[in-house]
UniProtKB/Swiss-Prot annotation:
The keyword Cell division does not apply. The gene is RPA3. This is Replication protein A 14 kDa subunit. It is found in: Nucleus. Ubiquitinated by RFWD3 at stalled replication forks in response to DNA damage: ubiquitination by RFWD3 does not lead to degradation by the proteasome and promotes removal of the RPA complex from stalled replication forks, promoting homologous recombination.
Length: 121
């Protein structure tokens, strides 16, 4: 079986979740809420729409701010997280709105942003 981390993954926002059921994705958002069990959290994207992130194991660290999640979209249009990274915003705040615009452009012009195409020289 192919490891999820090795697959090409689309960058998406919350409005695109339903289009990517059972596909690997990358989602960036601001942490809004952590479920009391620690096995789920909610991120808001650059448009203020929420995406629910499910974890296999409870969080073992505090998270806050901007988080990038890699995972697979479930049938419930949530993301089953394979890995996540917190962005450091100490000196340079992350512009989630601008990032969201870039995600839209990538999807509006797929001919210029091919996904998963390997070129051999």
């Amino acid at each position: 079986m192919v490891d999820m981390m090795d697959l090409p993954r689309s960058r998406i926002n919350a409005g695109m979740l339903a289009q990517f059921i059972d596909k690997p994705v990358c989602f960036v958002g601001r942490l809004e809420k952590i479920h009391p069990t620690g096995k789920m959290f909610i991120l808001s994207d650059g448009e203020g729409k929420n995406g629910t992130i499910e974890l296999m194991e409870p969080l073992d660290e505090e998270i806050s701010g901007i988080v990038e999640v890699v995972g697979r979209v479930t049938a419930k249009a949530t993301i089953l997280c394979t890995s996540y990274v917190q962005f450091k915003e100490d000196s340079h705040p992350f512009d989630l709105g601008l990032y969201n615009e870039a995600v839209k452009i990538i999807h509006d012009f797929p001919q210029f942003y091919p996904l998963g195409i390997v070129q051999h020289d």
